[in-house]
């Protein structure tokens, strides 16, 4: 998420040591190499089908949708997918919609999808693309359970906290990067999206403590992603304010159990 979504910055309090993984020089160099492998897809051609093949071959992918902060209330502009081989930016505005083959991948249990704020993204995909997102690992849920907090950190804020990176380095500090509905997309916008989705992927790797914890996050993420299901659009709008904690109550019932599991790891 980003400031174009209207989200105000929350105090970036220190996270517990067990979920802080400061980025070093080597990690930043690897990230820079990953940012050289960005593929923009705006039509159904060989590049599109090659991207789908790579995505289907993965066990885990990282996913962004822009704009999605207000769920169903904005049309889909961009879908970004990161694999171990690179980043694919699907220009949904140019394509017209998310076509069936890609939709089936998003709905399937495999590959697993690493996303942030699954309740907002799932609501968006359901109402804008008629896609019921499956196989979800929500990094927001993972951070909440790991740190025993309920602060609505955006993806850039969570990345900044977990990896010890200044917010300016995560966001780039350029307002034009946050307008993903205008065309053409700039080179800096594409690098910004690729950086977020790749760092989200890496964050999953670090927050994936054990099979037990991972399974719990998957289970809670799926339930959390359904937070807005069945609500009228007017009710959803009220509960999608930037500081909204709607749906967070689902995390509370699992908190004590998750804490006990973490103590045993």
From Swiss-Prot:
Gene3D superfamilies this protein is in? Answer: Ribonuclease H-like superfamily/Ribonuclease H (3.30.420.10)
* Residue intervals of the 3'-5' exonuclease domain: 32-82
Q: Does the keyword RNA-binding apply?
A: yes
Origin: domain of life? Eukaryota
- List the molecular function annotations (GO) for this entry: protein homodimerization activity; RNA binding
- Report the record's Gene Ontology biological process terms: piRNA processing
Q: Which InterPro entries does this UniProt record tie to the protein?
A: piRNA_biogenesis_EXD1 (IPR052144), RNaseH-like_sf (IPR012337), RNaseH_sf (IPR036397)
> Cell membrane as a keyword?
no
Q: Keywords for this entry? A: RNA-binding
Q: Kindly list the GO CC terms recorded for this protein.
A: P granule; PET complex
- What is the similarity comment for this entry? Belongs to the EXD1 family.
What this chain does, per the record?
Answer: RNA-binding protein. Inactive exonuclease.
How does the record describe its quaternary structure? Homodimer.
Q: What is known of its domains?
A: The 3'-5' exonuclease domain lacks the conserved Asp-Glu-Asp-Asp (DEDD) residues that coordinates divalent ions essential for exonuclease activity.
What is the official name of this protein in its record? Protein Exd1 homolog
């Amino acid at each position: 998420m980003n400031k174009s979504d209207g989200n105000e910055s929350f105090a970036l309090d220190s996270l517990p040591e067990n979920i802080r993984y400061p980025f070093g020089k080597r990690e930043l160099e690897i990230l820079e190499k990953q940012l050289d492998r960005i593929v923009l897809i705006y039509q159904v051609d060989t590049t599109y089908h090659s991207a789908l093949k790579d995505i289907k071959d993965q066990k885990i992918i990282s996913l962004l949708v822009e704009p999605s902060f207000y769920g169903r209330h904005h049309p889909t502009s961009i879908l970004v997918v990161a694999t171990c081989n690179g980043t694919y930016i699907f220009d949904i505005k140019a394509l017209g919609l998310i076509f069936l083959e890609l939709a089936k991948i998003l709905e399937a249990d495999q590959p697993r999808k690493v996303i942030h704020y699954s309740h907002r993204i799932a609501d968006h995909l359901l109402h804008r693309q008629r896609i019921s997102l499956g196989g979800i690992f929500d990094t927001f849920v993972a951070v909440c359970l790991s740190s025993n907090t309920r602060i609505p950190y955006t993806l850039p804020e969570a990345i900044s906290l977990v990896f010890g990176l200044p917010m300016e380095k995560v966001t780039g500090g350029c307002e034009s990067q946050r307008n993903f509905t205008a065309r053409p997309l700039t080179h800096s916008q594409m690098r910004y999206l690729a950086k977020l989705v790749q760092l989200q992927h890496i964050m999953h790797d670090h927050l994936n403590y054990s099979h037990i914890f991972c399974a719990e996050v998957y289970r809670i993420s799926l339930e959390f992603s359904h937070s807005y299901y069945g609500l009228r659009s007017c009710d959803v709008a009220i509960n999608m304010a930037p500081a909204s904690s709607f749906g967070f109550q689902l995390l509370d019932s699992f908190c004590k159990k998750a804490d006990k599991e973490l103590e045993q790891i």
